[in-house]
A protein has these predicted regions:
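C-terminal, non-catalytic interaction/recognition modules in large multi-subunit enzymes and RNPs
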Residues: 1-271
Length: 271
């Protein structure tokens, strides 16, 4: 026979073959202090859990998206940041170019709205090329993450919309106004209430409204998945926020980068 144990249990076999199962106090087992996060093993555990949260959101986005641009071309990203917009994890299937642009977009959202004007039910949106990825088809959405009433980070996603109005696949536009609909930094969802006026404007200005709206809803769903998983991590390990993890990730990343640069032979490099 097979005995299946929960993750918070331990088992021993006594001399006569009986199974002694003990339920472990998960609060004592999982609690990480600030110093422990710097431990390589603990950092690896937490960091991989955050990456897994982004990966799960990306898988959901792919399954739920309407357009082939996202579903087959993988022209999207899912990112988790700390409360200052510093990147903690990006989904493994996200395209590399967004790894630098999306955290910057989150920082622009923070500067535009300020943290005190954000609520747990908010979702922010923009496709401003100067605050986003450089062109209008990439729509970025961002959700503030709260734990115990405190802003602890952001989940964010960028996806290339199948259409955003304007001229189709043409190098002719000389101004951004010819490229399509511009969405300034707005609250697409304000404290749980969808901005239907904005959605109507968006639908009326694109050629494939169902696909554009469907992809956008898939992005919003992905934000919610990242929100839930991050709060699960914080509760499981009794962390108040992501600040200590963020510091540890940045320190480890800086160290690895410096080591790689140090390994480069001296010389003149051109690109």
């Amino acid at each position: 026979s097979t005995t299946v144990l929960q993750h918070n249990t331990s088992v021993e076999v006594d001399p006569v073959g009986n199974l002694i199962i003990e339920i472990v106090d998960t609060e004592k087992q999982n609690k990480f202090t600030s110093n422990q996060i710097d431990n390589p093993i603990h950092l690896e555990i937490l960091w991989n859990k955050v990456i897994a949260a982004a990966d799960e959101a990306a898988a959901s986005l792919l399954r739920s998206s309407f357009s082939t641009v996202v579903r087959e071309s993988y022209d999207f990203s899912c990112v988790i940041t700390d409360s200052n917009g510093n990147s903690l994890a990006q989904a493994s299937d996200s395209i590399p170019s967004f790894i630098g642009t999306l955290p910057d977009t989150v920082k622009h959202f923070i500067n535009h709205f300020s943290s005190e004007n954000l609520s747990p039910g908010d979702v922010l949106i923009t496709n401003d090329p100067y605050f986003g990825t450089g062109h209008l088809p990439d729509i970025s959405v961002c959700k503030p993450l709260f734990n115990g009433g405190k802003l602890i980070g952001f989940s964010a996603s960028t996806a290339h919309a199948p259409d955003i109005g304007g001229k189709i696949r043409s190098p002719e536009p000389r101004e951004v106004y010819e490229e399509g609909l511009q969405i300034p930094m707005l609250k697409l969802i304000n404290n749980g209430t969808v901005n239907e006026t904005l959605m109507t404007i968006l639908r009326k200005n694109v050629r494939v409204a169902d696909q554009v709206e469907g992809d956008l809803e898939a992005q919003i769903s992905a934000l919610g998945i990242m929100e839930k998983r991050i709060n699960d991590i914080l509760n499981d390990y009794q962390l108040r926020d992501l600040s200590e993890l963020s510091k540890a990730v940045c320190r480890r990343t800086e160290l690895a980068t410096r080591q790689e640069i140090n390994n480069l032979p001296d010389g003149t490099y051109k690109a």
